[in-house]
Amino acid sequence: MIIPAFDLINGRTVRLYQGDYSNQKNYNVNLFNSLEVYKSKGIEIVHLVDLDGAKNSANRQIELFKKIVSHTTVPVQVGGGIRTTKDISTLLDLGVKRVVIGSSIVSNKKQVKQWLNFYGPDAIVLALDVHVDGSNKKEISIDGWQKKTNFILEEIIEYFLSSGLKHVLCTDISRDGTLLGPNFKLYKEICSNFKNINFQASGGVASLQDIIFLKKTGVKSIIIGRSLLEKKFTIEEAVKCWQRES
């Protein structure tokens, strides 16, 4: 499916280039209107990133998410600095459909396993931000991509499979926000290796052709942010393109 994305700072829709807060672009969009339009076009879920919360957990945009859930009908998944059980419970109790876990996957693996077991695999999305080197080693980066780890994508997924892991949002960080096109090889490989995982592809989608090629890799969803905001194509075109390849 197509998953539109909004990155949010103080309620405003922005895009960061390569995760850099000092390199942000503001978009003059009405978030609530956009969500209702997307719902009317057949969108089943929207991806929201709390960039304030990602930077400082004290600045989480909880009131905004409360308003979104109560005033709109499209389900949402929310990510950005979710690090504690309280963070997860607060969002799920508001009515958020799924929470997206990032850095804790590496820094607090056992806790993340407990979350998968407690909340259920349909409520949790693991966000794996990957740097692929010349030898095809897929190293996980955390903390807004600022810090590389020694953890490898495949090892992380294997670790959580026993807890029923179902949803993985995988981003090739060299492509995000660039409109340079996705890393098709990466998605084809991981979809082939982990057939029971619902992969969400993120980063670099610039054209309808990218959607066609991504669908063929086996991903279950495509997250699209900048291309929709900058009207490279319409949501109707994206949805039709995805459905045509089914």
Curated annotation (Swiss-Prot):
Its EC number is 5.3.1.16. Coiled coil: none annotated. Disulfide bonds: none annotated. GO terms for molecular function: 1-(5-phosphoribosyl)-5-[(5-phosphoribosylamino)methylideneamino]imidazole-4-carboxamide isomerase activity. Keywords: Amino-acid biosynthesis, Cytoplasm, Histidine biosynthesis, Isomerase. One of its GO terms (biological process) is L-histidine biosynthetic process. The active site is at residues 7, 129. One of its GO terms (cellular component) is cytoplasm. It catalyses: 1-(5-phospho-beta-D-ribosyl)-5-[(5-phospho-beta-D-ribosylamino)methylideneamino]imidazole-4-carboxamide = 5-[(5-phospho-1-deoxy-D-ribulos-1-ylimino)methylamino]-1-(5-phospho-beta-D-ribosyl)imidazole-4-carboxamide. Pathway: Amino-acid biosynthesis; L-histidine biosynthesis; L-histidine from 5-phospho-alpha-D-ribose 1-diphosphate: step 4/9. It is found in: Cytoplasm. This is 1-(5-phosphoribosyl)-5-[(5-phosphoribosylamino)methylideneamino] imidazole-4-carboxamide isomerase.
